[in-house]
A protein has these predicted regions:
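Bacterial N-terminal signal peptides that target proteins for export
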Residues: 8-24
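Sec/Tat signal peptide C-region and signal peptidase I cleavage site
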Residues: 33-39
Length: 308
């Protein structure tokens, strides 16, 4: 992992040619595939519901977070997700993370491999999902995909040149409990994370609810119909660690969320978030763009077998 500000001359061109350009071309090619899907996605950025990716489908997503930093420099973090429906009960996902701290530098911060499993085949009033994630990242990570333990705003004051040298390997577990009632989705996520070095288990939570602006679909296909928009709210924060469990020295956020599902298969989402105590960033602005590709797995399989 390298910091862009540390690169000079030919090294910068090597990075662009060998790393950034291939990632951009791969994402552009995938996003250019036709998508034929009417699935509605919830607009959450932190919380998860009980829906998995359809088997054989691939979703490509770009997400960003702008955050304010008291006593330091504001930042813009970003990550790309590749989510694949392996089976009807298993969805797997790969992340590539980075961030830019203003008046500091740009850093690639790590990779993540996420897996979600659905133990119950049929829909229930409450649907459990088991979540397992492996993270290889450095201390400059600022994507705030979750808040755990005693994570606070002051942790982000360390300069990138120092923070990126501190590497960690973590395992993250979640129990997701989600259901739908009268068009509303309600979900609760309980988090436990462990740095594989000699560190205690850390805990966190996320709560969310959302609903389409209209439950009945329009008779004609349209982009601005009310049923294409989903609005909601999510709240998330840390719960301390094994030695000091609870709300002491933790940060918490409340964020309205809005998603726009387009008939073409694209989804746009946005969420302004607000810190609820002095340990939290005062303001977070998140936005994202995603595209689902139906039948990606079978299509790739046919390509390798030489069939049309």
């Amino acid at each position: 992992l390298v910091a862009a500000n540390d690169l000079q001359g030919d090294d910068c061109f090597v990075l662009i040619r060998k790393v950034l350009v291939p990632i951009f071309l791969l994402s552009s090619a995938i996003l250019g595939f036709p998508a034929v899907t009417e699935a509605q996605e919830n607009p959450y950025f932190v919380a998860y519901d009980h829906y998995l990716e359809e088997p054989g489908n691939l979703e490509v997503e770009y997400l960003s977070t702008f955050g304010t930093e008291r006593g330091g420099n504001d930042f813009h973090s970003y990550w790309t997700e590749f989510e694949y429906g392996a089976t009807a009960w298993w969805t797997t996902e790969f992340y590539l993370d980075g961030q830019t701290t203003f008046s500091d530098s740009t850093v690639l911060t790590g990779i993540r491999w996420e897996n979600r499993f659905r133990p119950l085949r049929r829909e229930h009033f409450i649907n459990p999902i088991l979540y397992v994630e492996y993270e290889h990242k450095n201390a400059a990570d600022k994507i705030l995909k979750e808040v755990e333990g005693h994570d606070v705003e002051a942790d982000f004051l360390t300069p990138n040149a120092v923070a990126r040298r501190e590497m960690s390997n973590e395992v993250e577990l979640k129990l997701i409990l989600s259901g739908v009632h009268k068009g509303w989705n309600f979900t609760e996520n309980t988090l436990a994370a462990k740095n594989l070095a000699n560190s205690p288990w850390e805990f966190g939570y996320a709560l969310a609810a959302s609903r389409p602006l209209a439950l009945e679909a329009s008779a004609k296909q349209c982009s601005f119909c009310r049923q294409n928009f989903i609005a909601g709210l999510e709240m998330y924060g840390g719960l301390g660690d094994r030695h000091r469990f609870g709300f002491g020295d933790t940060s918490h956020y409340l964020a309205p969320v809005l998603g726009w599902n387009l008939p073409s298969g694209w989804m746009l989402r946005v969420s302004p978030g607000f810190g609820l105590n002095d340990n939290s960033h005062r303001f977070l602005l998140r936005w994202g763009l995603s595209r689902e590709i139906t039948g990606f797995g079978p299509m790739v399989s046919r390509l390798f077998r030489g069939r049309p």
